[in-house]
A protein has these predicted regions:
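Predominantly a Rossmann-like dinucleotide-binding segment in NAD(P)-dependent oxidoreductases
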Residues: 107-110, 115-166
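Conserved SAM-binding strand-loop segment of SAM-dependent methyltransferases
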Residues: 40-47
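Beta-strand-loop-alpha-helix segment that lines the small-molecule cofactor/substrate pocket
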Residues: 64-65, 69-117, 131
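Glycine-centered tight turns that cap/initiate beta-strands
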Residues: 17, 40, 55, 132-135
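Short, solvent-exposed loop/turn and secondary-structure capping segments
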Residues: 7-11, 33-34, 71-73, 94-95, ...
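Short hydrophobic/charged patches on amphipathic alpha-helices used for structural packing
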Residues: 47-51, 125
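N-terminal Rossmann-like dinucleotide-binding module
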Residues: 1-38, 118, 128
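N-terminal Rossmann-like NAD(P) cofactor-binding module of classical short-chain dehydrogenase/reductase
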Residues: 58-60
Length: 166
C-alpha cells in the first residue's frame, strides 16, 4: 500500500462496482495511510492471512519485485484473481512457474504496464495512431518529478545497518 498501492486505491475508488475490502503492508506508516483511504477495509501485515479471506475475489500486487512471484503463486493457489505490477518476476524460472500455475486455474492474471492507462500517454498514442503528427521516426523522453518514488525512511532508521531476521 505504498505509493503504487495507493495509486491503485485511488483508481479503484473510481470504479462503482469495485469494493476495497482489505489492504496489506508490512510497513506500518503505509498501512495506516491505506486504512485511512479505505474506511471499513480490514488491515493485514501478512499477505498470506489476507489470501485466506473468503470475501476477497482478487488482489493487486504492488510490492518490490522480489515478492511478485511468491505472492502471485500464493494468490493463484488461493483462488484469487491477480493484477500485478510489472515486472512479472525476477527470473525466467519464476515466470514459467507463474505461467504453469495460471494454466491450472480459471483466474484472471494480468501484469500492469504503469503508463499504459495514463491519460497523457493514451492521448499521445491516439495522436500517433491517427496520423495527426505524421510518421514518428524517433523519440526522446525525459521524466522530471518533484518527489522520490521510493517510500520514505523514518529518520530513526537512517544510517543504521540492517540486521538479519533469521
Amino acid at each position: 500500500t505504498g505509493s503504487r498501492g495507493q495509486y491503485h486505491i485511488h483508481n479503484l475508488k473510481e470504479i462503482p462496482h469495485a469494493r476495497i475490502v482489505a489492504v496489506c503492508d508490512n510497513y506500518a506508516p503505509n498501512l495506516q495511510q491505506a486504512v485511512e483511504l479505505c474506511p471499513g477495509a480490514k488491515a493485514y501485515t501478512d499477505y498470506r492471512k489476507l489470501l485466506e479471506s473468503a470475501d476477497i475475489d482478487g488482489v493487486i500486487i504492488s510490492t518490490p519485485l522480489n515478492w511478485h512471484a511468491p505472492i502471485v503463486l500464493d494468490a493463484l493457489a488461493a483462488g484469487k484473481h491477480v493484477f500485478c505490477e510489472k515486472a512479472m518476476a525476477r527470473t525466467l524460472d519464476e515466470c514459467k512457474a507463474i505461467y504453469d500455475a495460471y494454466q491450472t486455474t480459471n483466474q484472471v492474471l494480468y501484469f500492469c504496464m504503469q503508463r499504459m492507462y495514463d491519460e497523457k500517454y493514451i492521448k499521445g498514442m491516439q495522436m500517433i495512431h491517427s496520423g495527426l503528427i505524421g510518421d514518428v521516426v524517433g523519440m526522446r523522453c525525459h521524466w522530471f518529478r518533484n518527489a522520490d518514488w521510493r517510500r520514505p525512511v523514518p529518520s530513526r532508521l537512517r544510517g543504521k545497518p540492517c540486521k538479519p531476521t533469521a
